[in-house]
Amino acid sequence: MTLRLSGIELRHSDGTLALRGLDLNIAGGERVAIIGPSGAGKTTLLNLLASALPPSAGQLEVLGADPWQLSSKRRQRLRSRIALVHQAPPLPARQRVITAVSAGKLGQWGLGKSLLNLLHPLDVSGTREVLARLDLADKLFERCQQLSGGQLQRVGIARALYQAPELLLADEPVSAMDPRLADHTLALLCQHAIEHHVTLVASLHAVELALAHFPRIIGVRDGQIHFDLAANEVDRQHLDTLYANEQLSPQPAPDVSETPWTPRC
């Protein structure tokens, strides 16, 4: 089992209970979409699965280990097997795209190789190849500040694919893309997961994209799992209850370029 959660709760430093009573199992190679209204706890759940946040209570197992029972060094080694795609990728404005993508391997490289890569990219062909899959090969040597929000999101996805993780977590990975590009990008992510037996868990605002691309749908509301169903079992009643007093249509995408930088996990 890639992910196992039992009785998980997570309370933020201000006392807010963000996740409560979560019981969840996700097997290796599964493709799972997490949907729910804004503020439901989707991003918090993904950060928990990435071992960026510790649970306040309950049992957590990620890739066969409890991250918070490991030493710092072993936990970092575990994190090198996990990729987290942020809605607003934490890419320094003046960083070149080739460096941003190759950073996906930093957790697997030693210090010397990582420093050398900053001075002179070590795998130009490999980074170009993964960017080409996302129609960004021509942006290889451009700076991140020259890219649009949707292009930055695709660079973040390219970095995750280049990392070649066992567990790929994606937080609203296509929110800044137009519908056609979002559909194409999710299809690419899912195909990669199938071909490489990668466990893929993505949070999405666009319900129609979640239902179209993911076999399993988890509905989250108020920090709790509202339903956990096969995509073909999710009906209008499930969605109406999940999004009670909410709009099903996605909100305008944020300007990724103006989002404050956050540290990479």
Curated annotation (Swiss-Prot):
Its EC number is 7.3.2.2. Residues 3-247 form the ABC transporter domain. InterPro entries: AAA+_ATPase, ABC_transporter-like_ATP-bd, ABC_transporter-like_CS, MetN_ABC_transporter-like, P-loop_NTPase. Its main location: membrane. It is an enzyme of class 7 (translocase). Residues 245-265 are annotated as: Disordered. It catalyses: phosphonate(out) + ATP + H2O = phosphonate(in) + ADP + phosphate + H(+). Part of the ABC transporter complex PhnCDE involved in phosphonates import. Responsible for energy coupling to the transport system. SUPFAM superfamilies: P-loop containing nucleoside triphosphate hydrolases. It comes from Pseudomonas savastanoi pv. phaseolicola (strain 1448A / Race 6) (Pseudomonas syringae pv. phaseolicola (strain 1448A / Race 6)). GO terms for cellular component: plasma membrane. Belongs to the ABC transporter superfamily. Phosphonates importer (TC 3.A.1.9.1) family. This is Phosphonates import ATP-binding protein PhnC 1.
